[in-house]
């Protein structure tokens, strides 16, 4: 499987749903999703970019661990990013956040949610994460 489109009538992506789907390159997440579960995309090494739609509230533990993400867009609806969500490959250099710096600072982020230096691009400026 190289691509997947999750329809709008699906409300959550369960734990391990696409675990180690090494050939998965493209994911379109429907607007009905409110959470991405633990290790949902863990080990999807061909997945390089993803846009998380508005309405997602939580990104689970290790949800994108060991993916080869280079960029990700996170909506202002996200209030929780659990530990190791973007852990693994160090190619993730930027996050586009669709809210302000103050809104980004309010997001609950678990320990080791990310392991690389990156820039979070907010609507009112950038944040450098070491």
Predicted regions and their residues:
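Structural signature of tandem-repeat unit edges
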Residues: 1-12, 22-35, 45-58, 67-80, ...
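A structural signal for leucine-rich repeat
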Residues: 87, 107-112
